[in-house]
């Protein structure tokens, strides 16, 4: 994983992004910052909107994002985290509890889970694909596959639809 000063994760070069895709990526970075630095939701949203989204930061040009989408994801994850985390935990394998995942992966899964739950207007395949792409921007190993499997299981539980995964059954 690449990083810039202050420990914020930065993605590898992604494919051409749309404004919602950029908002998703920024939301994951903001959620990471909140998790690692203990930054509050109002503070992190204000910082991203004032200094990051569509701006140049340390020689890197941030793309324009849909600010309402960004705010909705960040605020929604914060508001629903106590409901989302147990759902994510159930979708993980028993030997990988949510607490064992790094902050970036937790942020990706929380944002994806929130979107599956709250944004019924967005197709499941779009949500899963977008967050798998975000995972690919940060990771080169098995993490994107994990994101795909977990979000697919969550889609089955939340929406009753899936792209192929089966729900995890306890033995």
UniProtKB/Swiss-Prot annotation:
Sorted UniProt keywords: RNA-binding, Transcription, Transcription antitermination, Transcription regulation
Any one biological process term the GO annotation gives: DNA-templated transcription termination
TM annotation in the entry: none
Any single Pfam family the record assigns to this protein: NusB
Single Gene Ontology MF annotation: RNA binding
Stated role: Involved in transcription antitermination. Required for transcription of ribosomal RNA (rRNA) genes. Binds specifically to the boxA antiterminator sequence of the ribosomal RNA (rrn) operons.
Cross-referenced PANTHER family: ANTITERMINATION NUSB DOMAIN-CONTAINING PROTEIN, N UTILIZATION SUBSTANCE PROTEIN B-RELATED
Name of this chain's protein: Transcription antitermination protein NusB
Protein source organism: Brucella canis (strain ATCC 23365 / NCTC 10854 / RM-666)
